[in-house]
């Protein structure tokens, strides 16, 4: 929070597959005092809501480059995915961007650019690594699991 307002896409929780633990990242857009609250729940807990487990006050006195993380869908956390690059959730129109993520256990991983499916390439379980040319609207990473015919959304990037 900044001035008691939640920062949209200002944090990213992803599973560090090398260290076998969750990693929490924070992206601030302004200098000043920020309140970081971590919410959690146990995997075997049937409750739908998480509860606050720790709170940090962070005083940001220098801003190098403001950013937002991409929008993360629930399947990203359920499947313990991880983003290496790009961490910035807002991509520049027309730029060529490397995509590097860990997507464990998927049978297929693909992307849409401007709502158009790309050729499926660059995924060998658990690594997705490829380059894309950013279009004029959203980029979404999808994964298929087991014998299911539908894709689940994992990560959504916006375009400026």
Language-model segments: residues:
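Mixed-charge, low-complexity segments
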Residues: 1-160
